[in-house]
A protein has these predicted regions:
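Acidic, Ser/Thr-rich intrinsically disordered and amphipathic helical segments
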Residues: 1-4, 108, 118, 122, ...
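Conserved hydrolase catalytic core segment
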Residues: 1-32
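Short aromatic-enriched loop/helix-cap "lid" or pocket-rim segments at secondary-structure transitions
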Residues: 13, 27-33, 37, 166, ...
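Short, solvent-exposed loop/turn segments at secondary-structure junctions
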Residues: 22-24, 165-168, 197-199, 215
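Helix-rich cap/lid subdomain of alpha/beta-hydrolase
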Residues: 25-130, 134
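Conserved loop-alpha-helix segment in the C-terminal half of the alpha/beta-hydrolase fold
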Residues: 140-196
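Post-His helix in hydrolase/transferase enzymes
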Residues: 174-177, 201-218
Length: 219
């Protein structure tokens, strides 16, 4: 969202730090099941889709599943199965509030599924319409905005991207390759947090703050 906003309104943004960003996720990773489940074709009643998505999101007391659309296969030490739809993440049991064992990512998602009727439809909508996949064209506009600074048409000088080393959703090597191609190698800087997965922003807040501090100093 931040990258898309900046591509449309470059004059309003001086600096941009993206943490495990969507946008450049390659469509080739999405299985036919997710394509069908999140499609707007009308082949499945919306009530069925909501029920199926809720079951996929619900973790229960012992297991924690990824809440992202899954790719065909992933080979990553953080997960226990080859299909991301069945991937089990230990980090989903990470407490959001220190000292509160009931504030884990999985527990919060479960609570919303049970008590917030708008949560699942909102999640489905975000997957369908948010700029998650194949937004390379808009990212190239970001790169052009940076190149146009000398012409007075933008303020953004550099993009900082923070990635989890073992993130099976925002695949480090792919994002680095595609972001450099879209933005220009000299316009983007990467920080790979060693040992972190997709929940890097939750588990490694100190590393995120350090990158923000560096970026603010540069701006």
């Amino acid at each position: 969202m931040a990258a898309d906003f900046t591509s449309y309104f470059p004059q309003l943004v001086r600096g941009l730090v993206l943490v495990a960003p969507g946008g450049l996720i390659r469509r080739s990773h999405t299985t036919w099941k997710s394509r069908l489940l999140y499609s707007t074709s009308g082949l499945m009643p919306e009530s069925w889709i909501e029920s199926l998505v809720a079951k996929r999101l619900y973790t229960g007391p012992e297991v924690a599943r990824s809440i992202e659309p899954e790719p065909d296969t992933v080979e990553n030490a953080e997960i226990k199965t080859a299909n991301r739809g069945d991937a089990v993440y230990a980090s989903s049991h990470y407490a959001l509030l220190p000292g509160n064992p009931y504030s884990t990512v999985g527990a919060v998602v479960d609570w919303q599924i049970k008590h917030h009727k708008g949560f699942v439809p909102a999640f489905i909508s975000s997957i369908r319409y948010a700029p998650v996949h194949s937004e390379h064209a808009r990212w190239r506009i970001l790169g052009q905005n940076i190149a146009n600074i000398t012409k007075g048409s933008g303020k953004l000088k550099r993009v900082y991207i923070v990635l989890g080393e073992t993130d099976p959703i925002i695949v480090k090597d792919e994002i680095i390759e595609d972001a450099r191609e879209c933005l220009g190698s000299g316009n983007v800087e990467f920080e790979v947090v060693i040992g972190a997965g997709h929940e890097v922003a939750i588990e490694r807040a100190d590393d995120i703050v350090r990158v923000l501090g560096t970026a603010l100093h540069m701006w």
